[in-house]
């Protein structure tokens, strides 16, 4: 009789075990760059629902935002991040070089671990009083430019390389003339913030400068918040900006969060997430969803791929390392 009761009790415990697992909470931290704040605020809500439905677990997601280069340095120096969603491949490579992410991470998710893309545009005051149409106009006397610092901001490096790509086409690859062009542009910079969101604040809220060189999504968010005050100008040449994502292996193995961290990044490619990315003015990598939003995104702009300049390792060494071209042309 006692054995029978024990067996029944054990069976009851085993039957309850899966249900009790449904009360578990797991937590992860996503270290990201400046202009993704609003997008991840929305995305995290749908991912929490997705994870609960899939596993029965609750998930708590902590966000950290800042200039991409600075964020990468923080993670490399010990900021615990289960996942990183940064502005460019090079910033994640710097975390890999610190021994926290395994080699080959770029192949772990589709499209070189880039679930969405963007490009670089200009935000100007309503009516475009300075008549800014293309990169040439940013080198004119009397035009105040706002852009972040490429030493700390991934978006700023995309801004710089978009201008470099324009100069490359304009001067047929003559680097002397290209450097002069970039020098003139940066001589017109009135404030060089540490990150993209800080640059937006300087231009939109503090009224500094005549033109903000910005992520496309950041410019559209400003338009959404201040519909009667600003307008967007898309230059003739820009860059295919590819923000990238990765699981931080050292952290997830220590915290036992690999499964949820991997799914967190995988789900960025889902149709539901791609719609949220488009709503926040990032370009979905799902072509069908991108075309659905063609009334928002200019799909005709000439987007140069960073691979044309040897990829981010080469670009970083040539342009943004100490004594690189940026240091050469930016005299402040």
What does each of the following model-derived ranges do?
Residues 31-33, 124-126, 144-171, 185-189, ...:
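Short beta-strand->loop
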Residues 23-152, 295, 300-302, 330:
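N-terminal segment of the mature folded domain
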Residues 171-236:
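Ligand-binding pocket segment of bilobal, Venus flytrap-like solute-binding proteins
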Residues 1-5:
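Positively charged n-region of N-terminal signal peptides that target proteins for export
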